[in-house]
Amino acid sequence: MAEEEMRKHLVLAKPFSLEDEKDSEHTASNVIRKILSLFKTVRPGSDLTNFQLPPQLNLPRSQLQCYGEMVYSFVGQDLLGECSRRDLPIERLKSVVTWNISTLRPVVFGMSPYNSVLGETHHVSNGHINVIAEQVVHHPPVSALHATHEQENIDVTWCQYFTPKFRGTHVDVEVKGKRVMKLLNHIETYEMDQPRLIMRFLPAPGAYWAGKVKIKCPETDLEAELHLISDSFIERFRGNNNRSIKGKIFESSSGNQLYNIFGHWDRTVMAKNIKTGELEVIYNAKENITGLKPPTVKNLEEVTESESTMVWSEVSEGILKKDWERAREAKIVVEEKQRASLKQREASGESWVPKHFLVVKDGKDWDCSPLQPTVPPAPLVIT
């Protein structure tokens, strides 16, 4: 399909919001049989990185879009900007914790985004926040993201990749790489870990975030630890409900604890001052990730051929219209184009060079640095 014709079919799907979980199409009973049938021939411990799903089990967006939505898709308060607006270091760390929690989004059980193709990009703006993401490596699937806040002089970079493993009763997705936020007005750097994703089939189907997240700022000697509680039977028996979060803020050097963090990331999260006993709500999910809107096209001519919403537009349109044969055929076209590009590069001896990031492999780890200091305004915007 010619590029100009593809532009006419640009599909911008709505991000998954809290209220969408009540949609009957997303209930576990509607997908569990299809999923189990897919894994009949898959052995426990198998790497599922390149496992291909039928369109019926795909969300109408790529993995790269999902990463971007964690940063640019929100309603209400600009939580990223708040990280730099606070006067005291402890208040800034609390704001970074709040923003980090806000990047956690509901996961649709049994449904998965498309595997982003090499060179795919996603460029969206929301107010003063500009985000560019790029698929910089295909095997393993390494994604890089750069976001800048024009007004508050904030720089966010992600370099991450995931390794899904089939464990018999569940799929365990370990998200590797790092996230770094720089508050340039305060000369502070915050390094963050990432939680794991669990897709459980038995005994009760469900999808949830789990594991430990650390947030550390060397310049202020402050650190936070967040524990996302797994939705296992044992944890529920202990009284830890689905999507609960517990943690603490403390001084790195002394270990002196300053705050307790507790609550549910899909509802409210509280912070308790250890010294004064004062309680405050630091995050309200309903105010931030309810009623999310898709981007709109501000400048069609600036939408590039590598833009996620263009690469997958035919597939997404087929899924949204439940035209599964059309979606399947369109998905094959995208995959064949990817293979043809690889074959052409191998024949000519060319190496793939990302457009927006410098990528370095260090042993088994990857590091991605943006080539430009700031992200320009995007042709796709949140209004």
From Swiss-Prot:
Gene3D superfamilies: 2.40.160.120, 3.30.70.3490. Pfam families: Oxysterol_BP. Transmembrane segments: none annotated. Expressed in stems and flowers. Keywords: Lipid transport, Lipid-binding, Transport. SUPFAM superfamilies: Oxysterol-binding protein-like. It comes from the Eukaryota. One of its GO terms (biological process) is lipid transport. One of its GO terms (molecular function) is lipid binding. Belongs to the OSBP family. May be involved in the transport of sterols. This is Oxysterol-binding protein-related protein 4B. The gene is ORP4B.
